């Protein structure tokens, strides 16, 4: 193969594939270059010249850019398997993703990571895996599994593994927790991904000094700039709930691009269908005034180099032939996509080997009743979690709520309704209740087994009866999403693979999500993405007030607090 690449690059024999008649975006100079692009096997072998090809593709009037790289995501949050995610996202130009399977790992442990690694060997796109570092994320919740360093080391040398995934337990790092230290020491010299929302100053210095190189939780340009100036690559995030692109646009410049990359973290097929994936981030950034050279560098070459993938990210000889033919830099609509030199088609997807799903019957919660969700307050005021639309950071609020015969009651005029978390792994049967502000619900309940990071049942509702009905229905369908009103199911989407992923094609999941959103709106929901917004209310590593199966958590103090 090496001899063939040399001969085809030198023009001594026809290349396997030649893209002819178009221009490519040179991310070194920012120029649009008229040139053929020659490909041998999975590599680019020729640019800045004219080539003959065994197979020639006319791309007149089009522009070729490097394949896009999503540097941090949880495929499980797309609610489909890795194979279906491949079908969903690769045609939009995303040729490499760097995933953290900690959603399925929190439910199934090492079995979940193995499922992802097995799947990554069979997909058309290049799925790289970071080993989940914090399972569970904290001691303040009940997960289905625990991963210690001895559970991770058997996977460390897998060809798809880059390093250690987002180290969410930054208090544990700063406190030099022994298990945190064991994981960090084992992966020194390899890539360690970060997760440190609002961490600044000297504590940030200490965290970075543990060997952590990248971070995706910056929600302001000021925070992002501090992290970059201290040596981190900042991953600009725009997901279905966490929408930080607009706030970070001021630092997406040609000067800063080498220290930036793009990620989605959590993005579902409905948003991908309606808006796009990384292509949406690129279009949105350029429309907002970002220079194309800056955002395309962040989407490809800067992302690749941040994670040590030096074989991709440029349209240049010797680089992996991950290429996207787009209509224009501003439009960024993929018309042809090549992954490792292969033109993407349904036939290519159909030829993949399948991987047997895991994690069936993972919802082991006992049946609950309305009386399981009575709530009491120890003072005249009741704490409530304040939703901030488009953010996973929440507010810690207090309200004067009435006390009825069944405890503290919701107040619809104040947009305060009840929230509950039910342990679903069969460990202890914990149930915690609290209140939340910002959903807009006037009736019914919404429930989910997608509930970061331990993925217990999380329910928000206006009555204890509907909360119980929704929670029980999730057990009957092996997990997923449910919308209930007056005890009747208005819409549901089963996620039988670990209570996180569907066994259906992504098109079916997309359509089911549309029905679910409409049903949530019928209950009064004012949120653009109520289900993933609900999923982050139980995540006790994101400020400020959260709820787990063990109770309300003041994340700033890393302590439980009363209602």
Swiss-Prot record:
GO biological process, one term: adenine catabolic process
EC number(s) recorded for this UniProt protein: 3.5.4.2
Keyword Transcription regulation in record: no
UniProt catalytic activity: adenine + H2O + H(+) = hypoxanthine + NH4(+)
Keywords: Hydrolase, Manganese
Keyword presence, Hydrolase: yes
Name of the gene encoding the protein in the UniProt record: ade
Membership in a protein family: Belongs to the metallo-dependent hydrolases superfamily. Adenine deaminase family.
Gene3D superfamilies: Metal-dependent hydrolases, Urease, subunit C, domain 1
Origin species: Brucella anthropi (strain ATCC 49188 / DSM 6882 / CCUG 24695 / JCM 21032 / LMG 3331 / NBRC 15819 / NCTC 12168 / Alc 37) (Ochrobactrum anthropi)
Annotated GO MF terms: adenine deaminase activity
Cofactor(s) recorded in Swiss-Prot or TrEMBL: Mn(2+)
HAMAP family associated with the record: Adenine_deamin
Record-linked InterPro entries: Adenine_deam, Adenine_deam_C, Amidohydro-rel, Metal-dep_hydrolase_composite, Metal_Hydrolase
Source species, domain of life: Bacteria
Record-given protein name: Adenine deaminase
